[in-house]
Structures are given as structure tokens and as C-alpha cells.
Amino acid sequence: MPSKLNPSTLTAQALGWVDPNTRALVPPIHPSVPYERAPDGSYPGGRTYTRDQNPTYDQAEALITQLEGGAAARLFSSGMAAAATVFDTLSVGDHVIAPEEMYWTIRRWLHDLASRGKIALDLVANGDLDALRSALRPGTTKLVWIETPANPTCAITDI
């Protein structure tokens, strides 16, 4: 549920979090990678690996969720990790529309996926709404990827 507090108040108070053990007002940083494993190999604490389940992220994700009024938020170690997560939701044959000017690594990756038949891909000129409309394939277009400002040109797409 979105907070009624001003975003400045929310960020200054970090959701009013207080460490129950130390009474610290700022969440601790957890640099550890491994978590305890039980004799049967399970993870009794529920976390398996810090790269994707770091408790350091919990408060920041909760705060961003409140600030954006969303259902949830996720932090990633890089933009490419975030992009890969989005593209991983696609099924074989799904259609993707992406801008002609975009981060080169994502562009190369999308071309690779398309060349192997994993996705159908159309690139359109950044900000060209008519080209975007023309590229839409009802029933198969599952993702329209917009990068603004575009890397490396800083072209702006009005979203």
C-alpha cells in the first residue's frame, strides 16, 4: 500500500526501521556470500546465495516499493543483470521490440537470441511512435524495451 508520507520523509526515515538487536537506524551491510546449510543440504534461514538474496537489499527494496507505490521492487548488481531478468521472463518465439540505439551489450544479446530462434526481434528508431505501432504483433509482442536516455547517444524517448 502506498505511503501517505512525503517521499522526503520516507527516505529520511528509511521506513522507520530500527534493528531489533542493536537499535541501529541504518540497516547493516551483509558482505557474506554463503549461508548456513543444514545436514540435509537445505538452507534453514531461507537464503541460498547473497548475490540474489542479500539482506542488505531488503530495506532499500521496501523503501523503493513505498516510494513508487508498487507491489515490490528488486535491486540488481548491474543494469545487465536487471535486463537479463526481464528478458528471462520471455518464452521461445515471443516478439520483442527494442530501440535501434541502445546499450550495445543488450543489443548484441538480443540479436544472438533472435538468431538462435529464441525470440523474434524488431528494432525501431528511438522515439518513433509510428514505427513502434507498425512493429506491434498482436498476440506475440510480449515486450517493448525502451532505453531512455539511450546509450551511448543519450537520445531521449518520451515514455
Where are these regions (language model features)?
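Well-ordered alpha/beta subsegment
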Residues: 69-70, 95, 129-133
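Glycine- and other small-residue-rich loops at beta-strand/loop junctions that grip anionic moieties
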Residues: 75, 99-100, 121-124, 151, ...
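A glycine-rich helix N-cap at a beta->alpha junction
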Residues: 112-113, 117-128
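Conserved PLP-anchoring active-site segment centered on the Schiff-base-forming lysine
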Residues: 89-105, 124
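Short conserved active-site loop signatures built around small residues
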Residues: 1-29
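Buried hydrophobic positions in well-ordered alpha/beta secondary-structure cores of metabolic enzymes
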Residues: 23, 64, 82, 96, ...
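Active-site phosphate-binding strand-loop segment of PLP-dependent enzymes
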Residues: 126-159
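Conserved N-terminal alpha-helix of the aminotransferase class I/II PLP-enzyme fold
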Residues: 34-84, 89, 105-112
